[in-house]
Amino acid sequence: MPLSVFELVLMGRYAHLKSSFSGYSQHDIAMVDEILQTFGLAKFKERVASSLSGGEFARALLARAVVSEPKVLILDEPTSALDLSHAIDVLKLCSKLTRELNLVTIAVLHDLNLASLICDEILMLKGGVIAHKGSAKELYVPEILEEIYGLRGDIIYKNDMPFVLPK
C-alpha cells in the first residue's frame, strides 16, 4: 500500500517508539505536523508520497530525517535528479536546519559549484581516500582541481565565493 507524505515522515519517529507495538504518541504526530508545515509540505499531507515532484520528495525525505531528532545528518547526493532551483532550495534548507538545530551535516555532493554555496568545509577524495580538506576558497585552485578531477578550468569569484568554469 502506498504511503502518504504524513506516513513517510512519521517513519522518522520509529526509533523513538517505546516498543515495536506501542504505536506513535500524540507528541510524535504533533512533531510530524509541525515539520510538514516547516518544510512546506502540509498541503501534501494526505497525498501519496510517490506522486510528489522531485523537489517535494527530496524535502519529504529530509523532513523524515529531521523529525528523528538526529545530532548528525548524513545526506547522500540530496540534490540528485533535481533541477538547479530545487537543488539550491534543498541545500539552503539543509544549511538552515544545520544552524537552527545545531546539527553536524555531512553531504555527498558532486557539483563543485553547489558545494561552494553551502559547505563550510569540503573533503575531496581521490581513489576513495581523503586527498584534500578545507574551504572552497582553499581547495578551488587549478592545481587541486586538475589533480582530483583531471579538470582544467577557470575559478571565478562572485560574492566572495569561488565557482569553477571548466574549459
Task: Please annotate each region the language model reported.
Residues 146-167:
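ABC ATPase nucleotide-binding domains
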Residues 73-77:
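Catalytic Walker B motif of ABC-type/P-loop ATPase nucleotide-binding domains
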Residues 10, 25-44:
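Conserved ABC ATPase "signature" region
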Residues 69:
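Conserved catalytic motifs of ABC-family nucleotide-binding domains
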Residues 123, 127-138:
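Conserved switch/coupling elements of ABC/ABC-like ATPase nucleotide-binding domains
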Residues 88-101:
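Helical segment within the ABC ATPase nucleotide-binding domain
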Residues 48-52, 56:
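Conserved ABC ATPase signature
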